[in-house]
Amino acid sequence: MKHLGKHLIMELWDCDKQALDNQAGVEKMLEDATNSCGATLICIRTHKFSPQGVTGVAVLAESHISIHTWPEIGYAAMDIFTCGEHVNPEDAIPAIRDFLKPAKFDIIDIKRGSMVE
């Protein structure tokens, strides 16, 4: 069965708490993850919360990568949604793991827009 896109939902636990609260670091991680998976970056937007936490999104020509962090509990929720044949969202995972350093993580892999051939 063919599909239009691939959507990875990531649960990242016991992450580096300083990384989770580092807005510039999150922006760099989003850029690195985008480049690693072969996507085309349109823009990155982030917001730093007070007293802690960062939300960010990399808008891609092929869709998006998003992150929401909770430094107080060492947790991050991420989505990597890509469309197209030349982009592989799994290739973004090492850049994410290198920056956030999760002790454990889960990934849910969803095929979007499945079509019967």
Swiss-Prot record:
Key words, A-Z: Autocatalytic cleavage, Decarboxylase, Lyase, Polyamine biosynthesis, Pyruvate, S-adenosyl-L-methionine, Schiff base, Spermidine biosynthesis, Zymogen
Positions of post-translational Pyruvic acid (Ser) modification: S63
GO CC aspect terms: cytosol
EC code: 4.1.1.50
Active site: S63 (schiff-base intermediate with substrate), H68 (proton acceptor), C83 (proton donor)
One Gene Ontology term from the biological process aspect of the record: spermidine biosynthetic process
Name of this chain's protein: S-adenosylmethionine decarboxylase proenzyme
Species this chain originates from: Methanococcus aeolicus (strain ATCC BAA-1280 / DSM 17508 / OCM 812 / Nankai-3)
